[in-house]
Every structure is written in C-alpha cells, then in structure tokens.
Amino acid sequence: MKKKPKIPRAVIGTVLVFVVLLSVFMAGHDLWRQKQAQDTFEDLADLVTAPEDPEESQAESSAPEEFAEAQEPQEEQRNLSLLFEQNADCIGWICIPGTAVDYPLMHTTEDSEKYLRKDFYGAYSINGVPFLDGRCSLESANLIIYGHNMKNGTMFGSLKNYTDASYYAEHPTIELETAAGKALYTIFSVMKVQKEDAWYRFLTVDTETDFLHQIRYARECALYDTGIIPTYGQQLLTLSTCYGSSGGDGRLLIVAAKTE
C-alpha cells in the first residue's frame, strides 16, 4: 500500500498563519462597522438636539452670570422633524436616561424587520436600528420595540443589566418621543421568555379583564417585584432583545407602563 504524501510543515504553517490573520481581520472589520454605526447614531443625536437658531443659543450662553443662575434648566427637546424629513420610516426617538439606549425609532408595516440589519439611511449595518413591531401603531395597547443585544453594550446590549434589580432602581424610566411629544413609561416587569412567547401576541386590549390578565402574566414572569401594577387604560411599551446563547431563542423583555 502506498503511503499518503505528507503535507510539508511549511504549508501547514502558512495555512495557520493565514487563518489567524483572516480571523483578526474579520474581528477588526466587525469592530470598525460597529464604530461606524455608533458614529452615525451620535451624528443623528447631535442633529436633533442642535439649537434651531445658533445666534440665539450664543446669546443665551453669553448672558450675565446672575441672570443665567436665575433661569430654570430647560428640558432637552429634540427636533425630530429633521429626521422625519430624511427618512419617512422614522417615527420617533427611544431613550433610557443614563444608559446607552438613545436612538431613533423606525417603523415599517410591509417589511417589519427592514431595519434589523440596516442603518438609518438604508445601508447595511450589523447594528441595525431599533424598530417598532410592524403590527403595531403608536396607538397600540402594547408597543413592542426590537433592538440587537450587541456585545459592546450598544443598541439594546445594556438591557441585560436589568436582570439586576439595583440597575432597575437607577434606571426605571423609558422615554419615547414622537411627533405628538415626549411620553414617559415606568418599567414594571423584566422577563426572560422564548421568542414565541404569548406576550408577542399581546398588541390590543378588548376588555379590562383581558388587560389585567396580561399584567398578571407579566408580573408572574418578572425576575423581581418592582411594586408597580399598571391600571387599565395605561399604554404599555415593551423592549425586546436576544438573551442567552448566540443565535438561541431566548429573549429579554423590559415592560413599562405609560405614566405621562
């Protein structure tokens, strides 16, 4: 029997070096793409928070110190009309103060997951953009919003911190700003579920009994008791992201009720 020819060590070494270099390149490329995506979001945030009249802003900043101290701090307002003009799929801005969640919100009914891997401008993006479930409207009883659980903590990557009750205590409120204004939602349940969980089918409310049943379910599945029980008529908002093993069916839900 003829012996199989041995592969020269030099060839094996070359292949191994190539594989290592390719892995390093791919990892670096992913980091670069994530950085590009985050830069885009920061540019959008700067765009919507920039003063409409730079001269007026300069005048306010140069006001005498005694008058500046007397002025009450104004709540930051975003000029979302600039985003709406650039992309009609944008319906608002989602933010959890003090966290990395601070992004435009997209919505498409025909292709619900259009922004799963696209940036605000429609180009490919590993980060995607948070988007409202295509079955929802801004008047739905339960606004389900999706975002990626990025390893670097961007997008909805910081939501996993809500598995710790102390983090919830520091960040209990979600802000949703739309053309109608800013609404605040107070988190009342943090749940670990599967992607086919019944909660994803809860979009409308027919009766008070139905609403209370859903609230009971969310509180029973909660990782800890927040002490908050929503009342009938309050709109709910759910942030959904992947949780657990990569590519698995686990999902983390942050559920909040509209307070104002």
Please name every model-derived segment:
Residues 22-260:
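Solvent-exposed, non-transmembrane regions of membrane-associated and secreted proteins
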Residues 2-19:
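N-terminal Sec-pathway targeting helices
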